[in-house]
């Protein structure tokens, strides 16, 4: 996308319509200062645009990000355009209306994420956006100030003028909007998901308490109606009630029917994602831990066990003791090796929700208990980032999940292996291991 430097307006986030200058000279000075600040060559901008082919994303306006006056940017997108921590400002442009806003840009070290602050609320207010509203942005990185090109959904529908590539990208993005929920930049990815345990009382009483932090961050902390979205796309109507203590409870006949229709059982973990569809809040069932993945048994594990078996001839004295001791050591080594591998099966729900669940025994065997950022390493050493959101093994991968599977030739219904690599002072890695190999031992990154 080619941006016109003349389209970039004043540099403060609270600008609306500029007052008429007192003289022609003042006007000339204002224009000169404005152009100086944002002036860049067309060649430089085109180079930036060509290097970010997949730089569009959907930004959902919520009560939470308006209250916090902050919009988080997708981590994989900011990495792809080379956004650096030194940046303290980002320019939002609307080419159609010839307006621009300069907003503060900050970096959250704990979530490794860039976010817009001190200006997001004013920007939404100026553009008439309330909770449930949607923006479509294209991020362009550059040597001076990063740019967010603003493309409203209205401009897609009415066919107003704009750069051809930008219009195509936005139209394509709109058609894939449901699949991009996981890339919604309203907050860090972990705030949209919650993993709960279904109890017998939940079903009998048709009530389930929701975590306060989850309801608050997703604007679900007020009483009202909510839809529950099942695996097949069917919806159930339920109610959110607020108790005197401030706790939010999900209740109603629809909640019980939703649980039963989707095969949820007492004692089972299930994960819900908070989404908005045409301004209506929904809780979408992502998956359940006990039904989506096979336990850790795969070709890599089985082959490693075969390789580790020892055939020792009968002997006496020290020879017999050494053979027994060696057998034990190798068996322990084999166990440690096979514990590093897990076999998973890709389901349509995984791709749609951009998530996966790691078996609990795999988590325990490798001591995986630290939440936060992880790395997925593909066959060609390409990296994708994921976030471990709970100690029960729930992992959110964002839009990179589909790309990871496509790049490594994994299709829906097929199984694949991951090897866990834990090195000091680095982000833990899950490395792709093809099912076609008999056994591959990885001790560290090459």
Swiss-Prot record:
InterPro entries: B3_DNA-bd, DNA-bd_pseudobarrel_sf, REM_fam. It comes from Arabidopsis thaliana (Mouse-ear cress). The lineage of its organism: Eukaryota, Viridiplantae, Streptophyta, Embryophyta, Tracheophyta. The keyword Transmembrane helix does not apply. Residues 56-153, 193-289, 341-435 bind DNA. The keyword Ribosomal protein does not apply. It is found in: Nucleus. GO terms for molecular function: DNA binding. It holds the Pfam family B3. Coiled coil: none annotated. This is B3 domain-containing protein REM12. Its main location: nucleus. Residues 1-46, 295-334 are annotated as: Disordered. One of its GO terms (cellular component) is nucleus. Keywords: DNA-binding, Nucleus, Repeat, Transcription, Transcription regulation.
